[in-house]
Amino acid sequence: MAELSLKKIYSGKVRDLYEIDDKRMLMVASDRLSAFDVILDDPIPHKGEILTQISNFWFKKLAHIMPNHFTGDSVYDVLPKAEADLLKDRAVVVKRLKPIKIESIVRGYLTGSGLKDYQQTGTICGLELPKGLVEAGKLPEPIFTPSSKEEVGDHDINISYAECERLIGKELAAQVRDAAIALYKEAAAYALTKGIIICDTKFEFGLDENGTLTLMDEVLTPDSSRFWSVDTYKEGTNPPSFDKQFVRDWLEQSGWNKQPPAPKVPAEVIEKTVAKYQEALDLLTK
């Protein structure tokens, strides 16, 4: 990524943040890919641009449900033209918010770590679920299953709703849960009309200077969500998803021990991954 005239204040797994002033920052989505909490050496070309377009689409589509982190400024308002030209498709000007210290995960279907929990205990994050649900089965209602927010490189840990209340307070926990479920329901209903099932997703929220709950970071992208195609969906299976699953599957089969450094990912696996991200963008926004 090119050096910018702005001061970098944070570097995450995928996004970098730059200071504009005390109220705004520039958020830049890179082409970095993380799998199993390790950042891979091989970037996924155009991934940052595709993620930014998908996020921007959802932020606008869901703006009637709650406020979001956009300031209304363009990258050209805050960067020299040469820098803005380079980053215009992968950067956004956002409000500086106070992040809420949990990951807000909503699940509409049974898979992943939720499936493992359910098979062992009949619950997910302490929530009782009906007996007899199968892998990829639709849950009776979407559920809010928060996790703790850990540092880059550490695994986030699933927590109960009671633990969520203890971490952020009862009132805010209820606000976050209700907002996350409302956002998921609206997005899932829309995506279904485009041939995409949103299995689960992770939202990030912050508070603005007035204490207003605000949607931030990225929204309903293949990085923060599991998307399945309606065409290949089948209960009782593990449906293929529109995301980095190709890379994860390849890494699983490579014998890698999931500790840095990660092995070099073959070009054809990277190409298939780019195609999946692009397909998700095309289906959702056309």
UniProtKB/Swiss-Prot annotation:
Domain of life, per lineage:
Bacteria
Query: Known Gene3D superfamilies for this protein?
Result: ATP-grasp fold, B domain, Phosphorylase Kinase, domain 1
UniProt keyword list: ATP-binding, Ligase, Nucleotide-binding, Purine biosynthesis
According to its UniProt record, which reaction does this protein catalyse?
A: 5-amino-1-(5-phospho-D-ribosyl)imidazole-4-carboxylate + L-aspartate + ATP = (2S)-2-[5-amino-1-(5-phospho-beta-D-ribosyl)imidazole-4-carboxamido]succinate + ADP + phosphate + 2 H(+)
Pfam families associated with the record: SAICAR_synt
Which EC class does it fall in?
Answer: ligase
**GO biological process: what's one of them?**
'de novo' IMP biosynthetic process
Q: What is its EC number?
A: 6.3.2.6
One GO location term (cellular component): cytoplasm
Q: A GO molecular function for this record? A: ATP binding
Name the InterPro entries on file.
SAICAR_synt/ADE2_N, SAICAR_synth, SAICAR_synthetase_CS
Q: In which pathway does it act?
A: Purine metabolism; IMP biosynthesis via de novo pathway; 5-amino-1-(5-phospho-D-ribosyl)imidazole-4-carboxamide from 5-amino-1-(5-phospho-D-ribosyl)imidazole-4-carboxylate: step 1/2
Q: Which HAMAP family match?
A: SAICAR_synth (MF_00137)
Which family is it part of?
Belongs to the SAICAR synthetase family.
- What protein is this chain from? Phosphoribosylaminoimidazole-succinocarboxamide synthase
Organism field: Actinobacillus succinogenes (strain ATCC 55618 / DSM 22257 / CCUG 43843 / 130Z)
Please state the gene responsible for encoding this protein.
purC
